[in-house]
Amino acid sequence: MTAQIIDGKAIAQSIRTTLKQKVTQRRQAGFRAPGLAVILVGSDAASQVYVGSKRKACEEVGFESQSFDLDTETTEAELLALIDECNANPSIDGILVQLPLPAHIDDSKVIERIRPDKDVDGFHPYNVGRLAQRIPVLRSCTPMGIMTLIKSTGIDTYGLDATVVGASNIVGRPMTLELLLAGCTTTTCHRFTKNLEQKVRQADLLVVAVGKPGFIPGDWIKPGAIVIDVGINRLENGSLVGDVEFNVAAEKAAFITPVPGGVGPMTIASLLENTLYACEQYHS
């Protein structure tokens, strides 16, 4: 068996095209374009690349993007004050604060300062709680994008054994909630998990998000499984690889996401979808 590649790049581009059409229709009907505030603190190279991609995507679909690039020395109080300004600005529908933040700033305090109806990253406890209660509104972008990828396979998720490897607030935990909502019997693995191999081998649907190259050996994959690899790791030779041993896994799985070009583009597409949703449902 050779797995079908789930082309996140193509699916994300299709979403962007649809969003661009919706923004054009809004403008033609006399409504404003959605507005997204993107806040970057410090000069972390990877964060600058991610923020650049998000700003470019906003421009492509016709959103109004406001950029705030702050020095590493910016205080927590200064950042919170900027968030308050964005919360009060009626032309801003979504607020994105690029993580990680410098060590002297409390991530949780910053996330909770963003109004839940402008939390287009889907990190606010209110929005995560809505997902846990099975009434999601603004959903965490990476898990939301992954669900779109899974739906693209045409596989019915109800009753599938799903395993999530990684329990971060950004991916693993909300991913578990998304899969429960989709009718899966879901196991979440973390650093204290015993017999990880067994739990991976039983998975009809496997999502891996640990940030370690080749962490899951390809021969652990259940034949016919769907494999979603969230990891993006740069090796010493400059190449990018995921958390799953791709070449071996691709011989056993039915569907698999590549790295790059799988989950990454979908995270940004979901951010754009959330921003339009916030604009239409809450602010316009």
Swiss-Prot record:
GO terms for molecular function: methenyltetrahydrofolate cyclohydrolase activity; methylenetetrahydrofolate dehydrogenase (NADP+) activity. SUPFAM superfamilies: Aminoacid dehydrogenase-like, N-terminal domain (SSF53223), NAD(P)-binding Rossmann-fold domains (SSF51735). NADP(+) binds at G166, A167, S168, I232. GO terms for biological process: L-histidine biosynthetic process; methionine biosynthetic process; purine nucleotide biosynthetic process; tetrahydrofolate interconversion. The keyword Zinc-finger does not apply. CDD domains: NAD_bind_m-THF_DH_Cyclohyd (cd01080). Pathway: One-carbon metabolism; tetrahydrofolate interconversion. Keywords: Amino-acid biosynthesis, Histidine biosynthesis, Hydrolase, Methionine biosynthesis, Multifunctional enzyme, NADP, One-carbon metabolism, Oxidoreductase, Purine biosynthesis. One of its GO terms (cellular component) is cytosol. It catalyses: (6R)-5,10-methylene-5,6,7,8-tetrahydrofolate + NADP(+) = (6R)-5,10-methenyltetrahydrofolate + NADPH; (6R)-5,10-methenyltetrahydrofolate + H2O = (6R)-10-formyltetrahydrofolate + H(+). Catalyzes the oxidation of 5,10-methylenetetrahydrofolate to 5,10-methenyltetrahydrofolate and then the hydrolysis of 5,10-methenyltetrahydrofolate to 10-formyltetrahydrofolate. Belongs to the tetrahydrofolate dehydrogenase/cyclohydrolase family. NCBIfam families: PRK10792.1 (NF008058), PRK14186.1 (NF010783). Homodimer. This is Bifunctional protein FolD. It comes from Shewanella frigidimarina (strain NCIMB 400).
